[in-house]
Amino acid sequence: MAKDAIKLRAKVLEAYSMDDYLVELENKQQIKAKISGKMRVNRIRILPGDLVDVELSSYDLTKGRITYRHK
């Protein structure tokens, strides 16, 4: 997912658990996103309303991975 990933900015709408989130992309599309491994290891908290960077696979545009939380 590294080479052909699509990077977008999104806003977190809802937190389902510590790993699963509902995010809204810049084009108003809502997708499910999981937190990346580095963010999980470093225990970075993500709350509803946060702006995050999401990577989407070109194979499945309905699921993403949160890679960065903006301050």
Swiss-Prot record:
Similarity section: Belongs to the IF-1 family.
InterPro entries in alphabetical order: NA-bd_OB-fold (IPR012340), RNA-binding_domain_S1_IF1 (IPR006196), TIF_IF1 (IPR004368)
GO molecular function: ribosome binding; rRNA binding; translation initiation factor activity
Domain S1-like: 1-71
Function, as annotated: One of the essential components for the initiation of protein synthesis. Stabilizes the binding of IF-2 and IF-3 on the 30S subunit to which N-formylmethionyl-tRNA(fMet) subsequently binds. Helps modulate mRNA selection, yielding the 30S pre-initiation complex (PIC). Upon addition of the 50S ribosomal subunit IF-1, IF-2 and IF-3 are released leaving the mature 70S translation initiation complex.
Protein name: Translation initiation factor IF-1
Main location: cytoplasm
Keywords of the record: Cytoplasm, Initiation factor, Protein biosynthesis, RNA-binding, rRNA-binding
Record's signal peptide: none
Gene (UniProt): infA
Subunit structure: Component of the 30S ribosomal translation pre-initiation complex which assembles on the 30S ribosome in the order IF-2 and IF-3, IF-1 and N-formylmethionyl-tRNA(fMet); mRNA recruitment can occur at any time during PIC assembly.
Xref: SUPFAM superfamilies: Nucleic acid-binding proteins (SSF50249)
GO cellular component entries: cytosol
Pfam families: eIF-1a (PF01176)
Compartment(s): Cytoplasm
